Amino acid sequence: MKYQQLENLESGWKWKYLVKKHREGELITRYIEASAAQAAVDDLLTIENEPVLVHAWIEQHMNPALMNRMKQTIRARRKRHFNAEHQHTRKKSIDLEFVVWQRLAGLAQRRGKTLSETIVQLIEDAEHKEKYASKMSSLKHDLQELLGKE
């Protein structure tokens, strides 16, 4: 496993995930009967800061169909949590118009690179182009100066 699991922290994430799903209207319990499901949800809402009880609630009451999705969500959250500790692994987000994202994604796919690698490559290409243009301008100026002095 690449990232250390922190039971107390992840228990809070799981609790928040389940409460969010419940508020969005998803069935988070394994019970078909509405009163049993509501009783289980009420229990969940009272144990927010009790990692051991949250874990026990998940094993006893959670809808099994939700398990994989929750695991994936927690895994992604764990990765973001640990990556945020170091500046070089911290992720930033930017808003792109759909058409821009589509073109960037197509370019990245053609180059066989990630979106981040493609953006870095485009920036480097632009920097090289600026450097080249500056050099050419300087050479042109020097050449005109040489020709003008004769």
Curated annotation (Swiss-Prot):
Q: What is its main location?
A: cytoplasm
Which key words tag this protein in UniProt?
A: Cell cycle, Cell division, Cytoplasm, DNA-binding
Gene Ontology cellular component terms for the protein in this record:
cytoplasm
Gene Ontology molecular function: any one: sequence-specific DNA binding
> What Gene3D superfamilies does this protein map onto?
MatP, N-terminal domain, Met repressor-like
Q: Where in the cell is it found?
A: Cytoplasm
Cited InterPro entries: Arc_rbn_hlx_hlx, MatP, MatP_C, MatP_N, MatP_N_sf
Q: Quote the Pfam families the UniProt record gives.
A: MatP, MatP_C
GO BP term, pick one: cell division
In which domain of life is the source organism classified? Bacteria
What does the protein in this record do?
A: Required for spatial organization of the terminus region of the chromosome (Ter macrodomain) during the cell cycle. Prevents early segregation of duplicated Ter macrodomains during cell division. Binds specifically to matS, which is a 13 bp signature motif repeated within the Ter macrodomain.
What's the subunit arrangement here?
Homodimer.
Give the similarity note.
Answer: Belongs to the MatP family.
Would you tell me the protein name for this molecule?
A: Macrodomain Ter protein
Q: Which organism is it from?
A: Klebsiella pneumoniae (strain 342)
The protein's gene is named: matP
